[in-house]
Amino acid sequence: MAPPAPGPASGGSGEVDELFDVKNAFYIGSYQQCINEAQRVKPSSPERDVERDVFLYRAYLAQRKYGVVLDEIKPSSAPELQAVRMFAEYLASDSRRDAIVAELDREMSRSVDVTNTTFLLMAASIYFYDQNPDAALRTLHQGDSLECMAMTVQILLKLDRLDLARKELKKMQDQDEDATLTQLATAWVSLAAGGEKLQDAYYIFQEMADKCSPTLLLLNGQAACHMAQGRWEAAEGVLQEALDKDSGHPETLINLVVLSQHLGKPPEVTNRYLSQLKDAHRSHPFIKEYRAKENDFDRLVLQYAPSA
C-alpha cells in the first residue's frame, strides 16, 4: 500500500498518517470502507477529528446520502464541514443550485482562506457540476494539496488539455510520487495519452484493485483501458462486475452504453442502460448532453420534413 501523502491532506511532516486508511478508501472509491474506518479511528486532536469527519461526510455524499450530511453538520460545525454541507445542499436541491452558486461567487470574490483545502475542493466541485470548469480551475489553483492537484488533472483531461494535465501531474510526482492520488492521476493521464501508455494505466488500476478493493472507480478505469485497446469482450466482463456492485452507477452505465454500441448489441440493450441512467441521474452531464442532441435531431427532422 502506498505511503501517506505529505502536505495539507496528511499533516505534511512525513509521519505516519493516522487517517491514512480513511483517506485511501475514499480516494479509490471504497466509500463504505471509508465510513467504517472513520467511525473506528480515534483521532489524536480536535483538528484531526474535523479532518476525519470531512472524509466521513464526503463518503456519504458519494453514496448520494445527502440527508445524513444536511442533518448532522450544524451551523456551529467547523468551516471545513460547512463547506461539505454547502456541496450537499447543491447536490440535494435542483431548485436551489443557482442561488448556491451565486452565494459561492460572492464568497470567492472576497478573501478566501486558502488553507481550507476542503472549501477549495467543495467550491471547485460545485463549479464543475455547474459546467463552469474555468471557475473550478481558478479555485483549485489557490491550493497546493495533492487532492487539489488531482482534481485539476481530472478537469484538464475533461477539457482535452493533456499537455497541462501532464504538467500538473509532474507537480504531484515532485511532491509525492508514491501517494495514492498521484498513482491515480498517473493512470488517468496515461489513459488519456493512449497508445503504449494504456497498459501502464491498466496495471495501476489493477494493482490498486488487487491490493485494496475492486471499487467501481477502479473497475471502470480498467474497462476504459480495455475499450481504448479495442478489447471489448474483456471490458464487458469488468463492467458486468461493476454493475453487480451497483446497478445505478452512472459511469458504469455510460461505459455500458458505449460498449453495447461497439459490440453491435440490439438497440433495446443500449436503451435499457440509458433508461436506467435517466431514472437515477437525470441531471448528469451525459444525460443533459444526450437530451440536447435528441432535441437537435428532432429540430433537424422537422426542418427537412416534406411539407404537405
UniProtKB/Swiss-Prot annotation:
> Looking at the keywords, is Translocase present?
no
Q: What is its main location?
A: cytoplasm
List, alphabetically, the GO terms of the cellular component aspect. Answer: COPI vesicle coat; Golgi membrane; nucleoplasm
The record describes its membrane topology as:
Peripheral membrane protein
Which Pfam families does this chain map to? Coatomer_E
Q: Name one GO molecular function term.
A: structural molecule activity
Query: What post-translational changes are documented for it?
Result: Polyubiquitinated by RCHY1 in the presence of androgen, leading to proteasomal degradation.
**Which residue positions does Phosphoserine occur at?**
S13, S45
- What UniProt keywords apply to this chain's record, in alphabetical order? Cytoplasm, Cytoplasmic vesicle, ER-Golgi transport, Golgi apparatus, Membrane, Phosphoprotein, Protein transport, Transport, Ubl conjugation
For this chain's UniProt record, which GO biological process terms are given?
endoplasmic reticulum to Golgi vesicle-mediated transport; intra-Golgi vesicle-mediated transport; protein localization to axon; protein transport; retrograde vesicle-mediated transport, Golgi to endoplasmic reticulum
Location comes to: Cytoplasm; Golgi apparatus membrane; Cytoplasmic vesicle, COPI-coated vesicle membrane
- Indicate the family of this protein: Belongs to the COPE family.
The record, for PANTHER family, names:
COATOMER SUBUNIT EPSILON (PTHR10805:SF0)
Q: How does it assemble?
A: Oligomeric complex that consists of at least the alpha, beta, beta', gamma, delta, epsilon and zeta subunits.
> What does the UniProt record say this protein does?
The coatomer is a cytosolic protein complex that binds to dilysine motifs and reversibly associates with Golgi non-clathrin-coated vesicles, which further mediate biosynthetic protein transport from the ER, via the Golgi up to the trans Golgi network. The coatomer complex is required for budding from Golgi membranes, and is essential for the retrograde Golgi-to-ER transport of dilysine-tagged proteins.
- Protein name, as recorded: Coatomer subunit epsilon
Q: What is the scientific name of the source organism?
A: Bos taurus
